UniProtKB/Swiss-Prot annotation:
The gene is akt-2. Changing K209M: Probable loss of kinase activity. Increased apoptosis during embryonic development in an akt-1 tm399 mutant background. This is Serine/threonine-protein kinase akt-2. It comes from Caenorhabditis elegans. InterPro entries: AGC-kinase_C, Kinase-like_dom_sf, PH-like_dom_sf, PH_domain, PH_PKB, Pkinase_C, Prot_kinase_dom, Protein_kinase_ATP_BS. Residues 180-437 form the Protein kinase domain. Interacts with pdk-1, sgk-1, akt-1 and daf-16. Part of a complex containing sgk-1, akt-1 and akt-2. The lineage of its organism: Eukaryota, Metazoa, Ecdysozoa, Nematoda, Chromadorea.
Length: 528
């Protein structure tokens, strides 16, 4: 069991039995063996734990405090909903029991535990949280970079990256939004905007991602925001977007990053319809190196899609948006959170099966299929139909694709995770061995010595022509923190800020052009 639940003892069990839980994303019913403990911990398992052994890793991990229960008998008999306040948001989980008696037993147990813990805790700290259960999403990453460097005849196997770790410079809280001039909107999402800005003191251009704290809390995305901050700071690689600053304002979280003014790869593919196999091979090789680096640091990316692949002004890949990353997942480890973009989800994620880092290689298969075929491998207007296609439909390829390309895509888009290309312990190296990549010079690719097949025609450093005009034509302004004229009360303000106590502000010294030095012996990293 994970360390966060190591304190749980079997004598603290209040109730345990089989229940059916309704999925939060795919709204089907799933049997789980649930155990409720005195401290409010509610664990769900795919099978009943053995009595003579320690509890295994749970599939579901809830914390129920100050909870309310509601009984329902439609659309199924013996249903009940557990509601709990997480800061300003009511979180609901829906269950049904096999009988009315079992339902009543669970409701009484939940109410008893809730009443007991309500007396012990401040109501402002009550929550009901469901997390991934393998790893610690709120803990600091503890990554071993002491990989032994070995060389072989395989060019990819001997690719060594000597990465300069970013230097965290102690400084006072002097970085604020007032330090930047906002120029153009580059993108907008549910949680905020990405804006092209110029730092007043250095006159340098950056892309600043500004996230509304209120939206992060309302959507229960605090943990993902903290993860993005840690990953951005910890990871330095030529094909990952690099962080310059991260800080928080009163109502916003801000990430100041390098500006990749070549725009989204999605935009370029829309204009070209398809990419040649050679161009796809170039982008694919840079993506593979970047994902191999993340996996070596025990990070699963989980959000591979064309919209998250940018080009710099020279035409090299920059992967962006690390909010869905999962830390502390090494080879053999699995996690279970349903997350990602529907069209890019691996079958095991859709089917609610614990998954490993090979979900990233499925995502690579989807984006490379799009590049060469000009369309998604599976598409439908309704998610239900889309998920059915992803999990059951055979792949189809245009006749013009080479046998090497078909073999590569078939391997990456293998539905059985254990058989998927890249699923073994060799990870990225296994993908690199595909015949499709036989002519790739991996060391030269890493050093950016391979000429990109396409260089964006960027007219100036502030040219945003490769970004969606829907966004670049927007006025540069931030969304007010609250709807209406009402100002937050002191309690509400403290409640909001308490969510971000663990958010560390970072300042990376030096130029963002730094990333690796092939002559350094320190910090060697080998994709193995």
């Amino acid at each position: 069991m994970s360390t966060e639940n190591a304190h749980l003892q079997k004598e603290d069990i209040v109730i345990e039995s089989w229940l059916h839980k309704k999925g939060e994303h795919i709204r089907n019913w799933r049997p789980r063996y649930f155990i409720l403990f005195r401290d409010g911990t509610l664990l769900g398992f795919r099978s009943k734990p053995k009595e003579d052994q320690p509890l295994p890793e749970p599939l579901n991990n809830f914390m129920i405090r100050d909870a309310a229960t509601v009984c329902l008998d439609k659309p199924r008999p013996n249903m009940f909903i557990v509601r709990c306040l997480q800061w300003t948001t009511v979180i609901e989980r829906t269950f049904y029991a096999d009988s009315a008696d079992f339902r009543q037993m669970w409701i009484e147990a939940i109410q008893a535990v809730s009443s007991h813990n309500r007396l012990k805790e401040n109501a402002g700290n009550t929550s009901m949280q469901e997390e991934d259960t393998n790893g610690n999403p709120s803990g600091e990453s503890d990554v071993n970079m002491d990989a032994t460097s070995t060389r072989s005849d395989n060019d990819f196997e001997s690719t060594v990256m000597n990465i300069d770790e970013p230097e965290e410079v102690p400084r006072k809280n002097t970085v604020t939004m007032d330090d930047f001039d906002f120029l153009k909107v580059l993108g907008q999402g549910t949680f905020g905007k990405v804006i092209l800005c110029r730092e007043k003191s250095s006159d340098k251009l950056y892309a600043i991602k500004i996230i509304r704290k209120e939206m992060v809390v309302d959507r229960s995305e605090v943990a993902h925001t903290l993860t993005e901050n840690r990953v951005l700071y910890a990871c330095v690689h030529p094909f990952l977007t690099l962080l310059k600053y991260s800080f928080q304002a009163q109502y916003h979280i801000c990430f100041v990053m390098e500006f990749a003014n070549g725009g989204e790869l999605f935009t370029h593919l829309q204009r070209c319809k398809t990419f040649s196999e050679a161009r796809t091979r170039f982008y694919g090789s840079e993506i593979i190196l970047a994902l191999g680096y993340l996996h070596h640091r025990n990070i699963v990316y989980r959000d591979m899609k064309l919209e998250n692949l940018l080009l710099d002004r020279d035409g090299h890949i920059k992967i962006t948006d690390f909010g869905l990353c999962k830390e502390e997942i090494k080879y053999g480890d699995k996690t279970s959170t349903f997350c990602g973009t529907p069209e890019y989800l691996a079958p095991e994620v859709i089917e609610d099966i614990d998954y490993d880092r090979s979900v990233d290689w499925w995502g690579v298969g989807v984006v490379m299929y799009e590049m060469m075929c000009g369309r998604l491998p599976f598409s439908a207007k309704e998610n239900g139909k889309l998920f059915e296609l992803i999990t059951t439909c055979d792949l189809k390829f245009p006749n013009r694709l080479s046998p090497e390309a078909v073999t590569l895509l078939s391997g990456l888009l293998e539905r059985v995770p254990a058989k998927r290309l890249g699923a073994g312990p060799d990870d990225a190296r296994e993908v690199s061995r595909a015949e499709f990549f036989k002519d790739v010079d991996w060391e030269a690719t890493l050093r950016k010595e391979v000429e990109p097949p396409f260089k964006p025609n960027v007219m100036s450093e502030t040219d945003t022509s490769f970004f969606d005009r829907e966004f670049t034509s927007m006025p540069v302004q931030l969304t007010p923190p609250r709807r209406g004229e009402e100002l937050p009360t002191v309690d509400e303000e403290e409640e909001l800020q308490a969510n971000f106590i663990q958010f560390a502000s970072y300042y990376v010294s030096g130029s963002l052009e730094r990333s690796y030095d092939t002559n350094r012996s320190a910090d060697k990293y080998e994709i193995r």
